[in-house]
Regions:
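Short, solvent-exposed amphipathic alpha-helices that sit
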Residues: 24, 70-79, 103
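A short acidic, glycine-rich active-site loop
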Residues: 58-74
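Glycine-rich, Arg-bearing micro-motifs that act as flexible, cationic patches
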Residues: 115-137, 155-159
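Structural beta-alpha unit
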Residues: 1-4, 78-116, 153-166
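Short secondary-structure boundary segments
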Residues: 40, 119-121, 150-151
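Small/aliphatic-rich secondary-structure junction motif
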Residues: 2-61, 88-93, 165-166
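Short, flexible loop segments at boundaries between secondary-structure elements
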Residues: 144-156
């Protein structure tokens, strides 16, 4: 017998690729009558740098990580709007200054999540191929079920590449 989900945790970076992930997490939370926890990982960034980079054009230095707290706030606000419109009960929106996988894993444990919903964005950089992408790390280390949402267009997730120092 399958157990019901009581707390669904979803990661967002505010990108268009995150919309189907948040939408699916909200749908599951609504169907399961579960709480929804929205998590956004961010890296240190100045207010000036945040202001110069539109959320839709962000190419974070780490896949899935938003550059700065202000951009992360916009990302979780957008995700919450999507979730509420879908009928989900949002228990918390979290801004976590950490690696995206670690942010999801620790937030899920802290909020007693029994399902993590994450998007499948692949990091094509050398480091990404050696270390694995965020979804791979979460799937390997999660204490609960993990649902990986594929992009609607299969090529979309391949086009994400972190900035280089060049």
């Amino acid at each position: 017998m399958l157990k019901d989900y009581t707390t669904v945790v979803v990661g967002t970076d505010g990108s268009e690729l995150a919309v189907p992930t948040v939408t699916r997490a909200a749908w599951i939370a609504t169907k399961e009558d579960a709480d929804l926890v929205i998590v956004c990982a961010y890296g240190g960034g100045s207010r000036r740098a945040d202001a110069k980079v539109p959320l839709t054009e962000t190419a974070p230095s780490r896949i899935g990580q938003v550059p700065g707290k202000e951009a992360a706030t916009l990302a979780v606000t957008h995700a919450k709007d999507i979730a509420v419109a879908a009928g989900a009960r949002v228990k918390a929106t979290l801004l976590v200054e950490a690696d995206p996988a670690e942010a999801l894993l620790s937030s899920s444990k802290q909020h007693l999540g029994d399902l993590i919903v994450i998007g499948a964005i692949r990091d094509r950089s050398i480091a990404g191929r050696l270390l694995g992408d965020v979804a791979s790390v979460v799937v390997k280390r999660a204490h609960c079920d993990v649902l990986v949402i594929r992009p609607v267009n299969p090529d979309e997730g391949d086009q994400i590449c972190p900035e280089s120092d060049a």
